[in-house]
Amino acid sequence: MDESKRKALENALKAIEKEFGKGAVMRLGEMPKQQVDVIPTGSLALDLALGIGGIPRGRIVEIYGPESGGKTTLALTIIAQAQRRGGVAAFVDAEHALDPLYAQRLGVQVEDLLVSQPDTGEQALEIVELLARSGAVDVIVVDSVAALVPRAEIEGEMGDQHVGLQARLMSQALRKLTAVLAKSNTAAIFINQVREKVGVTYGNPETTPGGRALKFYASVRLDVRKSGQPIKVGNEAVGVKVRVKVVKNKLAPPFREAELEIYFGRGLDPVADLVNVAVAAGVIEKAGSWFSYGELRLGQGKEKAAEALRERPELLEEIRAKVLERSDQVVLAAGEDEGE
């Protein structure tokens, strides 16, 4: 950029800052990370992609994506992390599809989990607001926005038209909820589905139910969907690789991605996740299918390397500390193919 353009840009930025306040416009690479309380996601790769170490408390988070992509698994893992730190969690099951046994396998303390299965969208959102106002709940998950059916639709006939009711419901509720969550320092996670807009020829035809309010009020939006081939042991599929893209982030630079590995029946494997990130950070070396830490050979294949680290917790923590030291240089290439 030549000198005249640079000065013109500086003058424009100063005028904008004077009119609208500091931070109204900034360079993406210089965007400061805000210090907020967070709840870890259970995946180091995703915590680093979020830039703040987890999902923010006192804010709204939207997790959306196609069916069976790992959205509920991720939300339940966050609940387990909150409970592990002594927090209280609530699950508003609008879909009436919560599996307590699966939640337990993910580490959720189901006997302490607050669960509601509301009849209407209004009831669900009122429950969320009351729980947040109490100041005693650390994280609330709503599964899902698409299942928040307005009372008028429930009480009406099957063929009745109810245009915009759900969008209006979400807009009214979120206007109130945003301030309540900030005061109580409660994280609210809304799980959402995707729909396709009819007649879209150019651009992305996907949209999410519930209108635009959730997109606007959410501090973080995560796009969660399967990527690549299933994880196999021999010929048996034992899990799926899931790519999470931080589509919106008000607290750190957005558009980062993390690839997670979700295993059937047990969810995220934090040790395998750490191995992926440590390789990306250069803490663990990968030559062919062999994984090494310094002079120590961990094993052939990620499963063997992860197993070796599980048997040596002190080594696991040492590697984690080194990864965190290099977190600013980490290129999140978690879950890359092992060529096995």
From Swiss-Prot:
Record key words, sorted: ATP-binding, Cytoplasm, DNA damage, DNA recombination, DNA repair, DNA-binding, Nucleotide-binding, SOS response
PROSITE patterns given in the database record: RECA_1, RECA_2, RECA_3
SMART domains per record: AAA
Keyword DNA-binding: yes
Protein name in the entry: Protein RecA
Family: Belongs to the RecA family.
NCBIfam families for this protein: tigrfam_recA
Originating species: Thermus thermophilus (strain ATCC 27634 / DSM 579 / HB8)
Domain of life, source organism: Bacteria
Pfam families on file: RecA, RecA_C
Higher taxonomy: Bacteria, Thermotogati, Deinococcota, Deinococci, Thermales
Binding site for ATP: 65-72
HAMAP family reported for this sequence: RecA
UniProt subcellular location: Cytoplasm
